[in-house]
């Protein structure tokens, strides 16, 4: 293929990938974190290729083969093949074995955060040679990168489980490398290829300094990897088993939302209080109770003493008879436990969003290794900003409104009907 044909092909690929990346970002409600970053990287690549086409930049033909497109394409294809993609090109912080702070870029975070994917576009020959110490100075082997992923994942639990790691190879991987990764507990996706016997002259295996990711024929003659001999083709696992956390900790906001008259059909009012009218409108658009019920199903329910005590106090002041009755039934289903906030929760610095009550409730859930259900997203964000990431299920808030209905204006029948369709 001539350099011009290759350039045209690369430009066409870049344009297609931009469309796919944009579509990917739109596929999830609220978008995919890092989606804009992925698109901008692809657009930068396209801009560079167009400059080459216009004659503004002169590059070697070999460099055309080794642009970032191969890696970016691998990221897009990985994201398209996985469920519940929450972010791409996500940067995680972790501490290495020497106690130094490091960062790690995870190409695709999927399955609601439970799966980390590294997408690899480099050819099996190059990867295998780096692993055997025949790479350029400073090249980090895939196995070394896998060790970094494992270390980082153990410091970033999702719902108290370490994320599952998949290395997705789009230009094959040698059988010994695939085996080593599996031994480490990392899943492999891609073609696993055979390795030929050792050559007689290992000194011939030293790569030249000008090698790109897409090696020329001279390297293929001396490499041990036989890409024609595919031993196995492994697809992404269709079902990645996740250890679902079966413990749920209920925050005061969730207890209130669960028993609120708004959640039981009392949302067809215009209340004196603007915030209640807004919540009623939200409820007519999207019912919150089915979401809570679905998440709580088949799980053990907990609440700390402080949460229950404050909930009862609010209920005694503002609750209507139906709300109190539902509250009594709900409390019977809950294991009420003493306040026992975790150590990391106690390290949080108080602020407008972080008060002692929230700290106690979320910290107790953390200590129980439970997912805290809450409408208090402000606390969750503030804690996250201080480096403490709690396992949470966030929902819309609903206040106690039954006692407010007498002074509220009922919505006309046609309004309530229209809003429900």
From Swiss-Prot:
By its UniProt entry, which Pfam families does this protein fall under? DUF1308, DUF5614
Give the source's domain of life in one word.
Eukaryota
InterPro entries, per the entry: DUF1308, DUF5614
Family stated for the protein in its record: Belongs to the UPF0415 family.
| Name recorded for this polypeptide | UPF0415 protein C7orf25 homolog
Q: Which organism is it from?
A: Bos taurus (Bovine)
């Amino acid at each position: 293929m001539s350099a011009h044909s290759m350039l045209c092909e690369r430009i066409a690929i870049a344009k297609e990938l931009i469309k796919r990346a944009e579509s990917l970002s739109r596929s999830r409600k609220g978008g995919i974190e890092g989606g804009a970053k992925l698109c901008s990287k692809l657009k930068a690549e396209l801009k560079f290729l167009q400059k080459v086409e216009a004659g503004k930049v002169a590059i070697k033909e070999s460099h055309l083969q080794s642009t970032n497109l191969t890696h970016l394409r691998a990221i897009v294809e990985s994201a398209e093949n996985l469920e519940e993609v929450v972010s791409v090109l996500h940067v995680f912080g972790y501490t290495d074995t020497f106690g130094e702070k490091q960062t790690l870029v995870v190409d695709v975070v999927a399955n609601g955060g439970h799966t980390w994917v590294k997408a690899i576009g480099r050819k099996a020959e190059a990867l295998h040679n780096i692993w055997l110490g025949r790479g350029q100075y400073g090249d980090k082997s895939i196995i070394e990168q896998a060790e970094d992923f494992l270390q980082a994942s153990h410091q970033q639990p999702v719902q108290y489980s370490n994320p599952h790691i998949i290395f997705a190879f789009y230009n094959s991987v040698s059988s010994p490398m695939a085996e080593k990764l599996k031994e480490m507990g990392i899943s492999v996706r891609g073609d696993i290829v055979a390795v030929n016997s050792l050559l007689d002259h290992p000194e011939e295996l030293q790569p030249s300094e000008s090698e790109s990711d897409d090696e020329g024929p001279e390297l293929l003659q001396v490499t041990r990897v036989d890409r024609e001999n595919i031993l196995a083709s492994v697809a992404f696992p269709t079902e990645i088993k996740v250890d679902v956390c079966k413990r749920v900790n209920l925050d005061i906001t969730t207890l209130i939302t669960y028993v609120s008259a708004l959640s039981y059909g009392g949302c067809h009012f215009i209340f004196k209080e603007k915030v209640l009218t807004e919540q009623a409108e939200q409820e007519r658009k999207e019912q919150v109770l089915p979401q809570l019920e679905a998440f709580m199903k088949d799980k053990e329910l907990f609440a700390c003493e402080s949460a229950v005590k404050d909930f009862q106090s609010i209920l005694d002041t503002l609750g209507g008879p139906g709300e109190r009755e539902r509250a009594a039934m709900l409390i019977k289903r809950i294991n009420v436990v003493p306040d026992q906030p975790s150590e990391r929760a106690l390290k949080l610095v108080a602020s407008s969003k972080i008060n002692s009550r929230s700290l106690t409730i979320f910290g107790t859930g953390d200590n129980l290794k439970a997912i805290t259900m809450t409408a208090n997203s402000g606390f969750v964000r503030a804690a996250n900003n201080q480096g403490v990431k709690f396992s949470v299920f966030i929902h819309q808030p609903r206040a106690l409104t039954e006692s407010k209905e007498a002074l509220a204006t009922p919505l006309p029948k046609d309004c309530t009907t229209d809003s429900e369709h």
